[in-house]
Amino acid sequence: MMKLLIIVVLLVISFPAY
């Protein structure tokens, strides 16, 4: 459950970078 949250956070942070 924790890993999923971390993955989602990383995706949200990385997506606007593009």
Curated annotation (Swiss-Prot):
Disruption phenotype: None seen. An isbB overproducing strain cannot be made in the absence of the sibB gene. Keywords: Toxin-antitoxin system. It comes from the Bacteria. It holds the Pfam family Ibs_toxin. Induction: The sibB sRNA probably represses expression of ibsB mRNA, either by destabilizing the transcript and/or preventing its translation. Expression of the proteinaceous toxin is controlled by antisense sRNA SibB. Toxic component of a type I toxin-antitoxin (TA) system. Belongs to the Ibs toxic protein family. Part of the SIBb repeat region (formerly known as QUAD1b), encoded on the opposite strand from the sibB (formerly knowny as ryeD) RNA. This is Small toxic protein IbsB. It comes from Escherichia coli (strain K12).
